[in-house]
Regions:
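PAS-family sensory domains and related alpha-helical coupling modules
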Residues: 21-40, 149-167
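PAS/PAS-like sensory domain cap-loop motif
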Residues: 54-56, 68-79
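PAS/PAC sensory module
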Residues: 42, 108-114, 120-125
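Sensory coupling linkers of modular signal transduction proteins
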Residues: 1-22, 130-157
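N-terminal capping loop/helix in small sensory signaling domains highlighted by a polar->aromatic N-x2-3-F motif
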Residues: 61-69
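Short hydrophobic secondary-structure edge segments in sensory/regulatory modules of signaling proteins
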Residues: 43-47, 51, 164-167
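Alpha-helical sensory/transduction surfaces in regulatory modules that relay environmental signals to outputs
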Residues: 71, 78-80, 84-87, 102
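Terminal output helix/cap of sensory domains in signal transduction proteins
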Residues: 87-114
Length: 167
């Protein structure tokens, strides 16, 4: 009951400061982010949940694409409208601090860290969307390729081959 009251108060505060029309239903979020449905990387819009001290304590998935569902290893229909902590009991607070900064201070941030919730190394770029929300682009960091790293390996092979041919 207390959590529901906090949520309603939060929505009222956000509505007062918001000049942008906030989507109110899952359908409105789907329509707004339709272009993101087919992205080849995970994307989500999350609504932050704050306590009385205005500290982030959780977030609610308001939109997500199928790539997000695959990365998070959860069905999309189970995620949308659910809080992160209700889906993952081993929630790590490090994500909250980054998303809170993007939401409250309008910062675009990047975090690369291990996610114990899904046992995956992640690269996440988050940015403000609607008041009280942030968007997140997520990548499995172990599946990403670094051009500079590949170029470095090519140079090492070239040097090695050059050294071997001169012997």
């Amino acid at each position: 009951m207390l959590r529901e009251e906090l949520q309603k108060n939060q929505e009222l505060i956000i509505a007062k400061i918001s000049k942008k029309k906030l989507p109110l239903t899952a359908e409105e979020y789907r329509k707004y982010y339709k272009i993101c449905d087919a992205l080849p990387f995970a994307f989500t819009d999350i609504e932050m949940v704050f306590n009385e001290e205005k500290k982030a304590v959780d977030w609610i998935f308001r939109y997500g694409n199928e790539a997000l569902a695959a990365l998070e290893k959860q069905p999309l229909d189970k995620m949308i409208g659910s809080s992160f902590s209700s889906l993952f009991s081993n929630m790590d607070a490090k994500w909250l601090h980054v998303y809170e900064r993007a939401t409250l201070y309008g910062e675009t941030l990047e975090i690369m860290d291990y996610s114990p919730e899904i046992d995956t190394n992640l690269k996440i770029i988050c940015f403000p969307t609607f008041p009280g929300h942030c968007g997140c682009i997520l990548f499995n960091a172990d599946q990403m390729k670094s051009i500079s790293e590949e170029n470095h390996l090519v140079r090492l092979v070239e040097v090695s081959m050059k050294n071997n041919s001169s012997k």
